[in-house]
């Protein structure tokens, strides 16, 4: 309902969506009344660290930074599988980090918006993908990646508010 009201007032412009996810930690201990772990939470590895809990996947309007979709899954669900649920269908561009590589090629991917135009997926590369390039093209790639990252910063602000201001953890 809130998203509908914001759309009517023109606050959600639907020109582009930024997608990202964050891990919401849950206690992995069995030292509780039921003597059990949370059955819906799972573990995942991020870098070299294991985490137990959930993932909050969000879709944020590119222009305003307002959240229009939220999906919560167990932590072992890969980011790229949730992308269709985070899109409005009206966007022209989708931004995401390297965890979303191949989102446009997956089965069930939304490749055209409601007006029939192709949606452009602007996903950051992994750093290792530009190692085999020439120095000149590496500079161009670095510039393009920085542009994508500057747009994606809006979604990180949302996670900062959720985790720091609201102390969001289970």
Q: What positions do the PLM features span?
A:
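Helix-centered, glycine/charged polyanion-binding patches within enzymatic domains
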Residues: 92-93, 98-170
């Amino acid at each position: 309902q809130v998203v509908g009201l914001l759309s009517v007032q023109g606050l959600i412009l639907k020109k582009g969506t930024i997608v990202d996810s964050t891990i919401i930690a849950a206690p992995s201990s069995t030292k509780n009344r039921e003597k059990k772990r949370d059955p819906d939470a799972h573990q995942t590895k991020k870098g070299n660290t294991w985490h137990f809990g959930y993932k909050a996947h969000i879709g944020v309007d590119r222009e305003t930074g307002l959240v229009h979709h939220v999906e919560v899954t167990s932590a072992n669900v890969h980011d790229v599988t949730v992308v269709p649920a985070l899109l409005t269908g009206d966007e022209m561009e989708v931004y995401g980090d390297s965890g979303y590589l191949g989102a446009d090629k997956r089965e069930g991917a939304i490749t055209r918006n409601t007006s029939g135009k192709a949606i452009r997926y602007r996903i950051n590369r992994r750093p290792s993908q530009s190692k085999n390039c020439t120095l000149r093209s590496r500079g161009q790639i670095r510039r393009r990646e920085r542009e994508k990252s500057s747009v994606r910063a809006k979604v990180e602000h949302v996670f900062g508010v959720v985790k720091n201001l609201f102390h969001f953890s289970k």
